[in-house]
Amino acid sequence: MSFVVVETFAHSMMATLSQTKELLRRADAVCFDVDSTVIKEEGIDELAKFCGVGDAVTEMTRNAMGGSMTFKTALTERLSIIRCSREQVNKLITDHPPQLTPGIRELVEHLHQRNIKVFLISGGFRCIVEHVAAQLNIPLHHVYANRLKFYFNGEYAGFDESQPTAESGGKGKVISMLKEQYGFKTVVMIGDGATDLEACPPASAFIGFGGNVIRPQVKERSSWYVTSFGELLKELEKI
């Protein structure tokens, strides 16, 4: 998922292409973005369309991309327009389940076979991301995403602002936490957007993904940029 990143990028040293490939091969863990990476869609845009406010939210996303507001502010304002109920979210998942990007199932399966831990880190919503994780046999405790809150009658009540993924720079915070919690030495982040790129460091390497949408800023700054998961699988199968 790509969104506004107010901070400037400060990568002191980006790994070279060959270094990035080597880091993937010997990774302890691989972290994937979800929206426009593991799945074809942007979850919040799909939810907005489903709730009949797609145009308004798309316009707000476009304005926010200019860097005029933080991730949390932009998320708060978009959700205040959508105001989805629990019933609407459940119906979206049932009627329009997230579509996996071709090749992701095979890639995750191969990573699991190599005993490389796989995590999903998303600025999207946990209720949707958990559905994706289940399809990929990723344990739910390996999912980090924002939690929607609802009143007892199912009406929208906001989101959990304490989650690291609710903040700008949140994906990097999650990776730092994973390294500390599990003792991972090498963690690779894969994603399509600026919030994924900025998670390296603390990630050991970043791989840009353009299989669903190509973001020029990310492509330019990625030492390894792929447009299909098959490219990553092919590299891993060389050994």
State the predicted function of each range.
Residues S2-V5, D95, Q99-K117, G124-I239:
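C-terminal cap/substrate-recognition subdomain and adjoining C-terminal extension
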Residues S2-R147:
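Alpha-helical substrate-recognition element adjacent to the catalytic core
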